[in-house]
From Swiss-Prot:
Binding site for [4Fe-4S] cluster 1: 62, 67, 73, 302
Name this protein carries in UniProt: Lipoyl synthase
Biological or metabolic pathway of the protein: Protein modification; protein lipoylation via endogenous pathway; protein N(6)-(lipoyl)lysine from octanoyl-[acyl-carrier-protein]: step 2/2
EC number: 2.8.1.8
Top EC group: transferase
Native source species: Azoarcus sp. (strain BH72)
Subcellular location, record wording: Cytoplasm
Keyword Lipid biosynthesis: no
SMART domains on file: Elp3
């Protein structure tokens, strides 16, 4: 029997999703999939960032989601902070973040986060979170508290938030964000609508699009952003259709990257997309009117987020 208080990962986490994972032959990684390990000064900076995070009892999605770019990003002194704990209330079978019953919110986290960002002298920061379906506002007020504290401690720091879908709490969450909107509002669509039941149990494609559009309607000067994975069984045409939907919902920025299976208990990789196809996605995105598009095998939602925001005119 599941122990909801224990953090579940891999096969244990995905054992109870509605559509079971169908095993597939493991594909050989092509030459263009390369995980970069830091060395020298970059390795020292990597260890320094990890130590700083542990000292302040903070989590990063870089670590919790086993991001392949962690050595490069930490080595450059950048990190995507994950607030509200490291236990998610969802069981998405592409994601390596643990599932279970989350701990109560830490009221000191916004201040601790702001102090850490100030100590690291970050010009650009991404703040994300686990899903918190146990909270009445989905965690929106905690996001706003983190934005406020960070702005107070680091007025020149640009803040991007990567938010969950606030399922059943959208209106409450959007009203709360009126208190202190971020500089960039990011919510990932993740995949095409046909694959939502398999890849995003508990989420709804149209609902996620509406979240992005309604935030933009309330804050037309704040850039909106979304990200997609490829390799889950979608077609190129389906990806292009999602891109059109995003533009129709006034989304400004786009990321598309290759899905990599975190473990045998997660969804398998069904195809490796060639860099030429990523280039096609990027070209089409700009033609559709996205202000910036980052598309490539190792691109992740917050990978080089500062450079993407600069390209879109935010910083």
């Amino acid at each position: 029997m599941d122990n909801p208080a224990r953090k579940q990962r891999g096969a244990e986490k995905t054992a109870r999703i509605p559509i079971k994972i169908v095993p597939a032959e493991r594909l050989k990684k092509p030459d263009w999939i390369r995980i970069r390990l830091g060395a020298g000064a970059e390795a020292e900076r990597f260890n320094e960032i990890k130590q700083t995070l542990r000292e302040h009892k903070l989590h990063t999605v870089c670590e919790e989601a086993s991001c392949p770019n962690i050595h490069e990003c930490f080595g450059k002194g950048t990190a995507t902070f994950m607030i509200m704990g490291d236990i998610c209330t969802r069981r998405c079978p592409f994601c390596d973040v643990g599932h279970g019953r989350p701990e109560p919110l830490n009221p000191n986290e916004p201040t601790d986060l702001a102090r850490t960002i100030a100590a690291m002298r970050l010009n650009y920061v991404v703040i994300t979170s686990v899903d918190r379906d146990d909270l009445r506002d989905g965690g929106a007020q905690h996001f706003v508290d983190c934005i406020r504290e960070t702005r107070a401690a680091s007025p020149s720091t640009t803040i991007e938030v990567l938010v969950p879908d606030f399922r059943g709490r959208m209106e409450i969450a959007l009203e709360i964000f009126n208190q202190a909107p971020p500089d960039v509002m990011n919510h990932n669509m993740e995949t095409v609508p046909r694959l939502y039941k398999q890849a995003r149990p508990g989420a709804d494609y149209a609902y996620s699009l509406r979240l992005l559009k309604e935030f933009k309607a309330g804050h037309p000067d704040v850039l909106t952003k979304s990200g997609l994975m490829v390799g889950l069984g979608e077609t190129d045409d389906e990806i292009l259709d999602v891109m059109r939907d995003l533009r129709a919902h006034d989304v400004d920025m786009l990321t598309i990257g290759q899905y990599l299976q975190p473990s045998g208990g997660h969804l398998p990789v069904l195809r490796y997309v060639h860099p030429d196809t990523f280039k096609m996605f990027e070209t089409e995105a700009l033609r559709m009117g996205f202000r910036n598009a980052a598309c490539g095998p190792m691109v992740r939602s917050s990978y080089w987020a500062d450079q993407q925001a600069h390209g879109a005119g935010v910083v």
